[in-house]
């Protein structure tokens, strides 16, 4: 629009030249009546270059320019009230080639078969956040996830349902020099270790961990009539984890130890004054550190009466029940994730989750929350700016995992060289997850890729994003009888580029692409089998990648909780120090 306005101004300025020329011819023709003026003007037009300056030339020029200016002003005023050809909308399709020319760079991410988005966000001024929408069978993995990972030009944190992506791409990333790390909740024996305690720098991080743990283990859509129980569990967990963080040796800072400490929290309903082994431990800490935050939070828990305290303990133990499983204890007793290096060197972190069970998915939620914290810390406190390597979160099956605070991170990650590809089946999923704030997700994704689906609210959403175009319509009318007549009328009306029904019937070979500030594109989905690196993938003939997790190290040191004798059958009578 500013370019068009500039061109119009030049056009009107050039229009003053013929106006001045006509004014000079008119000035030398003035004199006598109207018939003489017409004869003189006709003679002057026969010799248009023979101009004579008279005393009437300047006033005539000024009068003609004033009239010309008023005419232009009147025309522009009327034009400002209309948009020819856009009365009902100006939406139009862009060609894949034109959009690719605007946004593609040497280092880019593939979006469709013919459109790429460059990694240098300062050039095109768009974030790399992508919202991918596609129902089952819409080729979300084959046309988006796998091509992007095989491009291997950023670091990756990947949600991988069923281990399909790890098998197909892990080997190639290894060849490209990536450090491949895996949290495998499908085959726990093939998982690297992840211990959330390793990323606690101070007491504030402990509070974040407990808050994320509570939110991640709360069933989706549950509504508590009384938040007392959740708050009481929170206080107890804060006390125990703070105590381990401040007092225990490194090898006892894990959730296995949290479960063991919970066993020492003995409560007797009939004896309110009963002192449990855990009470004794916190009393000993209070004598040495009267201002301990752990002790203060434990006192909050102890405000509950005997029966209530027992219910809190049971509820907390049930919430943390997965940490009683030997496989989960082995996985969380040590750490191989090294989250602080995610943006420092070539790293690909896979979070393999089952697609038919979400029991352990809270571990991935904790991992991602701490990954964001570690990356933000590295960018803000170490590099004081963007990370050395761009980190992309490829969040397949996004709705399967609660990510507390994700909308806030999505809005702030760009300046730190972090981006997210949020992959959902339909808009109803994020509406259910984020209720009143769901629009912040598409609002912070400068690119939206629609691959197809069969959910009606998504069809309507996509149709509205496409917008309306102004089209010509033709109507026919006919009256019969002796004085019958037939008429044809032409008029303009508005029409969506695609109606919701047409969005539903979109050919499965095609995708709709929206990049902020550009017209929408309909293009073929990316053909994985034509990717330059497909021969290095298991889908192109290479061997599937099998990850072998590390074994937990053997720790030595003085334990926080020590049993008095090796033959003592009752650890509750052990010695605290």
Predicted regions and their residues:
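Basic- and hydrophobic-enriched, low-structure N-terminal and domain-boundary segments
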Residues: 1-138, 142-145, 189, 468, ...
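A broad, low-specificity signal for short, low-complexity segments enriched in glycine/proline
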Residues: 89-97, 106-107, 112-122, 142-143, ...
């Amino acid at each position: 629009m500013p370019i068009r306005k500039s061109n119009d101004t030049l056009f009107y300025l050039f229009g003053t030249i013929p106006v001045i020329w006509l004014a000079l011819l008119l000035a030398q023709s003035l004199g006598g009546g109207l018939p003489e003026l017409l004869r003189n003007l006709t003679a002057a037009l026969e010799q248009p270059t023979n101009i004579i300056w008279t005393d009437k030339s300047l006033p005539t020029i000024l009068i003609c320019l004033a009239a010309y200016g008023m005419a232009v002003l009147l025309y522009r005023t009327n034009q400002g009230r209309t948009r020819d050809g856009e009365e009902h909308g100006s939406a139009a399709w862009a060609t894949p080639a034109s959009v690719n020319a605007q946004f593609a760079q040497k280092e880019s991410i593939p979006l469709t078969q013919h459109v790429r988005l460059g990694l240098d966000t300062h050039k095109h001024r768009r974030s790399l956040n992508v919202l991918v929408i596609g129902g089952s069978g819409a080729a979300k993995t084959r046309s988006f996830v796998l091509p992007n990972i095989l491009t291997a030009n950023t670091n990756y944190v990947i949600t991988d349902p069923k281990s399909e992506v790890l098998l197909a791409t892990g080997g190639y990333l290894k060849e490209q020099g990536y450090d491949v790390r895996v949290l495998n909740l499908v085959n726990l024996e093939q998982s690297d270790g992840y211990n959330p305690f390793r990323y606690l720098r101070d007491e504030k991080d402990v509070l974040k961990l407990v808050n994320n743990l509570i939110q991640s283990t709360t069933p989706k859509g549950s509504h508590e009539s009384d938040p007392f129980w959740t708050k009481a569990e929170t206080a107890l967990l804060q006390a125990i984890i703070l105590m381990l963080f401040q007092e225990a040796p490194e090898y006892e800072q894990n959730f296995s130890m949290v479960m063991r400490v919970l066993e020492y929290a003995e409560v007797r309903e009939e004896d309110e004054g009963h002192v449990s082994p855990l009470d004794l431990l916190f009393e000993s800490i209070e004598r040495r550190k009267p201002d301990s935050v752990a002790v203060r939070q434990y006192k909050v828990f102890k405000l509950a009466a005997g029966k209530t305290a027992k219910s809190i303990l049971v509820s907390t133990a049930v919430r943390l029940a997965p940490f009683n499983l030997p496989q989960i204890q082995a996985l969380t007793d040590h750490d191989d994730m090294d989250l602080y290096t995610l943006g420092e060197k070539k790293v690909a972190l896979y979070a393999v989750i089952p697609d038919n069970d979400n029991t352990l998915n809270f571990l991935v939620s904790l991992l991602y929350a701490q990954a964001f914290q570690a990356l933000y810390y590295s960018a803000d406190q170490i590099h004081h700016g963007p990370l050395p390597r761009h980190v992309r979160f490829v969040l397949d099956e996004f709705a399967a995992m609660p990510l507390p605070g994700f909308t806030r991170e999505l809005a702030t990650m760009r300046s730190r060289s972090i981006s997210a590809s949020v992959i959902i089946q339909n808009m109803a999923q994020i509406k259910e997850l984020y209720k009143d704030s769901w629009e912040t997700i598409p609002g912070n994704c400068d690119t939206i890729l629609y691959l197809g689906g069969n959910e009606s609210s998504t069809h309507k959403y996509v149709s509205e994003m496409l917008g309306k175009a102004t089209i010509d319509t033709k109507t026919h009318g006919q009256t019969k009888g002796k004085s019958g007549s037939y008429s044809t009328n032409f008029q303009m009306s508005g029409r969506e580029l695609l109606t919701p029904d047409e969005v539903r019937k979109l050919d499965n070979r095609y995708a709709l692409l929206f990049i902020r500030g550009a017209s929408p594109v309909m293009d073929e989905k990316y053909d994985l089998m034509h990717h330059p690196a497909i021969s290095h993938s298991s889908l192109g003939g290479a061997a599937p990648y099998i990850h072998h997790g590390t074994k937990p190290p053997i720790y030595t040191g003085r334990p926080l909780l020590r049993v008095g004798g090796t033959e003592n059958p009752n650890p509750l009578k052990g010695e605290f120090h």
